[in-house]
Structure formats: C-alpha cells, structure tokens
Amino acid sequence: MSDRYIDFANSSIGHRLVGALGLPSPVRLERWQAGRLRPVEGALLIGGGPLAARVSAFANRLTDGIYRYGEQPAAASEWIPGHGPKLKAVVFDASELQHTDQLKQLREFFQPLMKNLEHSAHLVILGRAPESLSDPFASSAQRALEGFSRSLAKELRSGGTLQLIYVGDGAEDQLEGPLRFFLSPKSAFVSGQVIRLTACATPVTDWTRPLAGRKALVTGAARGIGASIAETLARDGADVILLDVPPAKTDLDALAARLGGRSITLDICAEDAGAQLIEQLPDGLDILVHNAGITRDKTLANMTPEFWDAVLAVNLNAPQVLTKALLDSGTLHDNARVILLASISGIAGNRGQTNYAASKAGLIGLAQAWAPTLLERGISINAVAPGFIETQMTAHIPFGLREAGRRMSSLGQGGLPQDVAEAVAWLAQPGTGAFTGQALRVCGQSVLGA
C-alpha cells in the first residue's frame, strides 16, 4: 500500500514542516529498474588497503566513473573532496587495520565523503573476520569495524546504505558478486549488515542473466513476497516452478503462465509431501526457496495448541522435511542454493508471536547447522530475514502499529516485496557459494534486534 507520509515528507510544504518539527524525513529509495545495465550509475570511489586493487580490477564492469582516494588503486582518477563528483558508491578496504591507532583511517577516509554522497548511495567496508586472526589487537581492530559500520549506516541520509564484508582467506577473488548486489539498487532496503565470505570457485558467466538454465522452486508463490521472488528469479533467467496450496491454484497458474514456468499445488504439511514433490521434479532443482509461511498470533497465555502446531508445521517442520527429502533423493543438485524466508521476528522476537518467532529463528538455526555439511556438495543455505515489508498482511495492521513499524529503521520506511526478492535472487546465483550459513536482514537497518 502507499506510504502517504513519505509522499507528504517529500512535498514542498511537508519537507519544511517535517524539518521544523524534527520528524523523520524518509526519501523514496532508488530500486532496480528493467533495462538497467550496470550496478552503479555514477561515481565509484575505491580506497584503503590491498583489496582495493582487487576491486579495481573489475570496477569498470560496475561503472564508468572510477575514482580513488588515497594511494589505491593507482589506475583510477583521483577524487578530491569538494571538487570531485558526488559519489554513488564507495568501497573502502579496512582489512589491514590491525591496531587501535590505525582505526583513525576510518574517520580520515569517510569524513570528507559524508557531504559528497548522491541520493541512495551505497557504501561497503571490507575487513577480515576477527575470529580468524591470532593477534588479539588485530582481532579487536577488525571487530571495531562492526560498531563503526552500523553507526555510520545510521548517519547516512537520502536513502544511503552501508555494509561490512569480512573477506575470508581465498575469498579475495569472490568480491564482484557481492559488490554487484550491495553497491546497486538491488540492495536498497539492506543496510548495516555484516557479511562473511568464504572461498568459492563457482563462477558467474552472464551477469545480466546469472540464473540462466537453473531450475528454481518457490513455495508460497501465488501472491505477495513469493510471487515477487518468482518474478525476479525468472527475470534473472531461472526456469521457475511455483508451489502453493490447492485453494491458490487460479492465481498460481496465472502467474506461472505469465512467467513461462509451471505450477504445483501441494499441501507441504502432508505426510507424503516429500514423495509427491520429488515425483513432480524429475529434472531436479538448482534453487530451492522456502517462502511459504503463516501467522496465528496470540499472546502465549491465550495461545491454543492448534495455533502453535499450525505455525510450526508450515513455517519450520515442512522446510526441514522437504529439504531433507530433496537432498536424500538427489533431486537437489550439487552446487544448489537453498534460501529460507525467516523474519526479523526470529531475531528480535515480537509480542504475540512466540510461535511465529520460534519458527523463524528455527530456520536461521537450520541454515547455520546445515551449511558445513552441504558445503561438501557445493550447496549453500542461507536465511533471509525481512523486516517491515509492505504487503497485504501489513496493510491490515492497525494504523499506529503500522506507522511505527515503518519508521523504526534507519531508512524510515517499509520495504517492498521486490527488496526481499532481490536478496533471494542474489543468494540464488552460482557465485554466492562464498556466502552460506548466514541470515541476511532485509529490514532497512531496523532498530529491532539490532
């Protein structure tokens, strides 16, 4: 539904009034549009340590306007504060900051940029995982990056975002995929996140259609976020298979026909659901997206056994059982991608949602637990945790709660189903095997669970 407050805050009268009263002033976020060719449309600034040179090697595939601030990379044009162009994207390599005294480089690099960023600018800091370092001082310095990045993300204005990527040993050559996502409008509603990359050798041959030839199954696909995920996967070249309950067959069939895919109606909680699904997937799967989910909200004092059991069965048990069946049967191919739709409620909790929050936290735990084993087959498994997303469900939330949900993030607004779909589509790419066992929040840096 339309966010009328954003419309008002960005009108000439509303902008002045909001500023005078000190109210939140969210802006319309720039999102990926059909026909766009490059991740960054504007100036990209690269600086910092040796990983900056790695980024420089493929930066011309991200944008034409490449600038440097500091010594790295020498091939780029020098950016001069106050004289260079406004910046659309920034990458800073902080991986060699190994002592408290060196942390001042963060202030020295970023302070001059703060008033020179374009609308919806995207910033990324590169580091090394603190737990991988033997020197306590170096580990402390790298851990400090998290506090800095999350705080700076909250200071960005005009729809800006910032992420911290910890680059593991052997993952230095895996940066293009993550930067294509996090420096582009595809990550418009992702901010303040800490990402860990491990070594991965699966390449992407076509960045315009990275999912070409891959078969993708999306559950709960008839409408809402599930439908948006199916549309986005199809846009990126996947052969989509849409699954939902029998009562949703009409909408499901129509969407499948529009996307050139096919539909499956199935009760995923049925005792033989796994066997039925395997039978309908003779060619196997490369991408599995567990989006199907329900809510049955009550405080625990008033929670009925039926409400509890239904939510846990659909949201958690079904993904567990179906994924295991697809793995054991070989239906899920090697180098496949499994994405579980969790929720910010599974991280922060939510009053009246003990059943729902438990189910979504369980999905995050499932991704963490299964990741090491599945990595042996080249399979990655991750959770996506949406925050407040504008859907039919949130449209029925009482006005006061809905407005609070929208404003309680650094970006000051709710996300769109497209935002969740873009995150899923990125995680579905062959080249994202370096990212596994993690939960990616799509929440605009919500204050909940921060």
Placement of each model-derived feature along the sequence:
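Short, small/polar-rich loop/turn modules that mediate ligand/substrate recognition or access, typified
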Residues: 158-161, 189-192, 335, 375, ...
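A conserved structural motif in NAD(P)-dependent oxidoreductases
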Residues: 169-175, 409-420, 431
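Conserved glycine-rich Rossmann-like NAD(P)H-binding loop of the short-chain dehydrogenase/reductase
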Residues: 63-72, 238-253
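Residue(s) in the substrate-gating loop at a strand-loop-helix junction
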Residues: 343
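Alpha-helical segment proximal to the catalytic Tyr-Lys
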Residues: 154-155, 328, 372-373, 433
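Active-site helix of classical SDR
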Residues: 141-145, 323, 359-362, 367
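Catalytic Tyr-X3-Lys loop
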Residues: 81-120, 124, 137-138, 294, ...
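Short C-terminal tail/terminal secondary-structure segment
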Residues: 191-212, 436-450
